[in-house]
């Protein structure tokens, strides 16, 4: 493993599990000093314990004051943030559980040659579910970026990697709120990148395809095989593959990437 990130301070939101956990491990393996920020402090502590060194802190990214406090904690304990990975997210699990039975009926009807069951995901979506995903994904990405840039800008250096999704590129059936939030992150990334590069801060995004995480295993068991079957690569992605993409963007190897979106997705989307 190369040490491209030696001595860099990296703050990873949603660092307590799944893709975020893999990102923490990969950045640490490349020499970074990692702060795992997560809404679950025990989960973040477990990740840092496994790494062997670093900082674990609790944060609700939808709370701007909590974000400011968490970034201040990182800078107080570890020094200025060199790398920020805005990875914290949610999929609206209650919504997924309601829509999954309809998806299964649609698959059966498609096999029979005629679809008669509408998803009606949009009209079933509550105000609370819509706002929750916007708060976690969009508000959280903005709050964390703003907090980190306050110190990055006067130092004239820094890297920010935002976690989007192929759902933000082309939309995902049954998830209008998630798709809208992830598309918003892509727009925010492009705008912030153009503004901040003149201050020496690079901003880019990663838009993964479907990744084999515990969240997918717990909510979409029946759909996982169908997703893998329609992916040209024939399988789901792994958290480690997404983490490798993040590590590249965080390194000087990606010095000419500004406002870019890298999409490791197994061929589901080939034009980004």
Q: Each PLM stretch: what is its role?
A:
Residues 2, 89-91, 170, 247, ...:
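Short C-terminal tail/terminal secondary-structure segment
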Residues 3-35, 192:
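Canonical Rossmann dinucleotide-binding motif of NAD(H)/NADP(H)-dependent dehydrogenases/reductases
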Residues 41-42, 59-71, 90, 127, ...:
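The beta1-alpha1 cofactor-binding region of Rossmann-like NAD(H)/NADP(H)-dependent oxidoreductases
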Residues 90, 101-142, 157, 161, ...:
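Catalytic Tyr-X3-Lys loop
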Residues 145, 181, 189:
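Active-site helix of classical SDR
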Residues 150, 194-195, 255:
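Alpha-helical segment proximal to the catalytic Tyr-Lys
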Residues 165:
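Residue(s) in the substrate-gating loop at a strand-loop-helix junction
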Residues 197, 202, 257-259:
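Short, small/polar-rich loop/turn modules that mediate ligand/substrate recognition or access, typified
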